[in-house]
Structures are given as C-alpha cells and as structure tokens.
From Swiss-Prot:
Gene from which the chain derives: glyA
Cofactor requirement: pyridoxal 5'-phosphate
Reactions catalysed according to its record: (6R)-5,10-methylene-5,6,7,8-tetrahydrofolate + glycine + H2O = (6S)-5,6,7,8-tetrahydrofolate + L-serine
Cytoplasm listed as a keyword: yes
Organism, as annotated: Neisseria gonorrhoeae (strain NCCP11945)
Lineage start: Bacteria, Pseudomonadati, Pseudomonadota, Betaproteobacteria, Neisseriales
Name under which the protein is recorded: Serine hydroxymethyltransferase
NCBIfam families to which the protein is assigned, alphabetical: PRK00011.1
Site (Plays an important role in substrate specificity): H228
Length: 416
C-alpha cells in the first residue's frame, strides 16, 4: 500500500532536488524558445492524477480492457472540446506526440514509396515533413519546397513541383516560419493534382484557437497539432479532420498500428488545456502573443539585427546573425548566461552545420503566459540585442542578467 503522506522529497531527494532546480530555472530565466510554454496548475494536476494507473487500449465505448467507464468520460471530454475549439468533425486525442500524429496521417492513406511534397527543413519546415533523417523521408519519396528570394513561402514553386511530381499528399505547416500560411492556396494546388492536403499546425494552434491565425481545418483533409507550444497544454498530439471520411483509417493508424495503450493522464491534461483555450481570456492571450512577437522583431531591427522574412505575423521569428559574425550556437550560450533562453536555428541557405547554425529562433508564447506586455517585450528585445552586441563581455552579461531577474521577479510563472 502506498502512503499519500510520503512526499517525493522524502522518498527521492535527488530527483526532487533536480525538479526544484528546474522550477527555479523556469522562474529566473525568460523563456523565448518558440516551442515551449508553461501549463496551468490544473493541467499539471490532471497529468499527475491516478489516471496514469489505467490501461485503456481502444477508444471510448470500444475498449479491450475492463474498468474504462471513467476514462471513457475523460477521453470524450477531450475529443468534444478540441472539436469545438477548431471546428472539426473528427478528432483523435491519443497521439503521444505531434510526430506520431503525423506518422499516423501518412500511414492512413499512403504506401511506402508514395510521393509527398513538404516544406524543406532548411527553410523552416519540420523533420516529419519529409526530411531525409526522419522516417517520413525514408518511407516516402519526399520532394521539398521552400522560400523565395524575399524569404516568403514560394507558392509558385509549390505549384510547379506539385504539377511536376504529382504527389499523393502535400504537407503544409512549419517549425520556423514567421508569416501566415495561405491554406486556401495550398488547397487550390492540391486539387489541381488530386493530392491530399495535410497541415501540421503545431506551432500555430494556440493562435488559431484564439482567432489570431487562419484555421486550416476547413481547407484540409488532415490537420495535426501538438498540444503544448502556443496551445499551452501537456506534451502530446492530436489529429483533426473537417469530416469523418478517414475516421476508421486514422483510428487504426494510431491503435493498434503505431501505439498501444493511450496515456489517459495526459489525455486528461489535454482536456483541461482545451477547456482553457475555449475561454474568452485565451483570445486575449493569443492576441498579446502576436503583439509581443511583432514588437520584439521591430525593436531588434531598430538595433541593427536582420529578421528572416523581414517581420513576423505569428508568435515566432528567426534572427540572422551572420552580419554580427556570431553563430547561433554562440548566441544561444551567451543569452543563456544572461538568463534568456533561446534555441540556435538554421536560417534559409545557412552555411553552418545544424548544430552550429547562423541564426536563433525567438518565440513569445511563454513570456506572454507570464504576463509580459508590449512594453516588457520592447525592454526584453533590447536586452537580447545588448547580449548579441557583446556576447563575450562578462560584465555586460551580468548587467543584462540583473535586468532579466527584475523582469522575472515582476512576473512569476506561478503566483500564490
């Protein structure tokens, strides 16, 4: 029998100490990694619940195990809420990650060797959109499109490649593209060649939910998203469709093809996050995310930095560091010393290796969750610029670190 009175700190002080240190880091550092965010205490409570004890292979009312009457309620809540959130007719909330959701979409209608057309990883796409190092680039014949000379998504190239290669599926969505994507244009191109249209909106889902980014669901055969990032939920994935045409194929692609039992505690946490995203205040959050990102990009331009694509229309943008003679790896390290967390990121036509890069990626989702407004975003962008101007000056880094501490103390991640 387990005792509820025994704490983690009592049972495993080493692990508890590491968690406490990470908690302190999150409080003391400004998080600007575009794929990260903070979840609510309610989300964490659901994910840490007794639901982790329950195996539930199958789907609500169609399980391979007994005792699933209550987890059925949990999963159905998540399904109903995410369908309402994005206007979808079909939803599968069981994918353990966005990558597995994407794999399931491919497996539902494609055969090995079929051609897919996706955004190049080097131009802002994602590994799972056909990159050669990913299973999607090994199982399928992946053709890639990219950005034009103005660093805008090249729809003419997408159409040209689609007409030339006749892909069975066109993949839209990105992990490092700042501008809005024209889903209707992608639908038009897909229809010209009889291709399925699949959108991975993992980075933009929270903005879509908040009405600050176009909703791809009405235009697509398949839509996937992660449930963290801008959506502010637990780490996991979701598949959505505008109708139920592919319901059977998608469900079987997840279970039993790619996964076994669903993570019911995570699905419960997803349900909480979906409820939060349905509230009016989430729309204000999404609006502020876009405002903060735009302000930061504009302020960095004023400080002489170059923003890929020239601006942002979302939560994310890339900074080209080549004019400053500093790599993304070095910039990430210097900013980290100042308690500003970013990730190094390749820019279009990057001459550096992927583990070095010539750029950094900046996102505003997590800082906005803390309560940062446009005034704070302006201050923060100047602190970033200060570090990049003198990345090896320890006195400069210490000065910036002190200013970051003041900002973080003003906006605690979790209040009382």
């Amino acid at each position: 029998m387990f005792s509820k009175s025994v704490t983690l700190a009592q049972y495993d002080p080493d692990l508890a100490a590491a968690i406490a240190q990470e908690d302190r880091r999150q409080q003391d550092h400004v998080e600007l990694i575009a794929s990260e965010n903070y979840v609510s205490c309610a989300v964490m409570e659901a994910q840490g619940s007794q639901l982790t004890n329950k195996y539930a292979e199958g789907y609500p009312a169609k399980r391979y195990y007994g005792g699933c009457e209550y987890v059925d309620i949990v999963e159905q809540l998540a399904i109903d809420r995410v369908k309402e959130l994005f206007g979808a007719a079909y939803a599968n909330v069981q994918p353990h990650s966005g990558s597995q959701a994407n794999q399931a979409v491919y497996a539902s209608v494609l055969k090995p060797g079929d051609t897919i057309l996706g955004m190049s990883l080097a131009h802002g796409g994602h590994l799972t959109h056909g990159a050669s190092v990913n299973i999607s680039g090994k199982l399928y014949n992946a053709v890639t499109y990219g950005l034009d000379e103005n660093e805008v998504l090249d729809y003419a190239e997408v159409e040209r490649l689609a007409l030339e290669h006749k892909p069975k599926m066109i993949v839209a969505g990105a992990s490092a593209y700042a501008l809005q994507i024209d889903w209707a244009k992608f639908r038009e191109i897909a229809d010209k060649v009889g291709a399925y249209l699949f959108v991975d909106m993992a980075h933009y889902a929270g903005l879509v939910a908040g009405g600050e980014y176009p909703n791809p669901v009405p235009f697509c055969d398949f839509v996937t998203t992660t449930t963290h990032k801008t959506l502010r939920g637990p780490r996991g994935g979701v598949i959505l469709c505008r109708d139920n045409t592919h319901e059977k194929a998608l469900n079987s692609s997840i279970f039993p093809s790619l996964q076994g039992g669903p993570l019911m505690h995570v699905i419960a946490a997803k349900a909480v996050a979906f409820k939060e995203a349905l509230q009016p205040e989430f729309k204000q959050y999404a609006k502020q995310v876009k405002i903060n990102a735009a302000v930061m990009a504009e302020e960095l331009v004023k400080r002489g930095l170059r923003i890929v694509s020239g601006r942002t229309e979302s939560h994310v943008f890339l900074v080209d560091l080549q004019p400053m003679k500093i790599t993304g790896k070095a910039a990430e390290a210097a900013l980290g010393k100042a308690h500003i967390t970013v990730n190094k990121n390749a820019i279009p036509n990057d001459p550096e290796k992927p583990f070095v890069t010539s750029g950094i990626r900046i996102g505003s989702a997590a800082m906005t969750t803390r309560g940062f407004n446009e005034t704070d975003a302006r201050v923060l962008s100047n602190l970033v610029a200060d570090v990049l101007a003198n990345p090896e000056d320890e006195a400069n880094l210490a000065k910036v670190r002190g200013q970051v501490t003041a900002l973080c103390d003003k906006y605690p991640v979790y209040g009382n």
